[in-house]
Amino acid sequence: MGQKTSPTGFRTGITLGWQSTWFASKADYGNFLIEDQKIRAYVDKKYNRQMTKAGVAKTEIVRTRNEVKITLHSARPGMIIGPRGGEIDILREELEKMTGRKISVNVIEIKEPDLNAFLIAEALAEQLGKRASFRRTMKLYCEAAMAAGAKGVKIMCGGRLAGAEI
């Protein structure tokens, strides 16, 4: 029987970079790992799960001796930065309060959101939550990705779709 391999773990270091870049002693490693998870969960909850969806597809964390550098890859960076940079300062202060470390936040715009798998999946799930036709919605996102320049698209959707009974 074939064994399933995590695609992220399989590609990390070869075609993908790490999501967190830091080194720690044995005593600090677990604390840093939990801190990274808290930061990612907070950013995801604030910018992807609430009504103001900024489309944060990736959160990179780099730790140096003095500070934690967080890079957010977003489809709509204006939602994160806010007017005159006010929102990003609030985010930085909240993360500093949560972690107790000096934090710098950088926001990078995703040039083609139609080519980002995470953003496509989030948008598709949102449409399915609104009870849209799953075949039409999947076809629409496939065509949008191909029009944006993708070489190929494969979308898999499972569950009890279209009100299918057991």
Regions found by a protein language model. Name each.
Residues 1-166:
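RNA-contacting regions in translation and RNA-metabolism proteins
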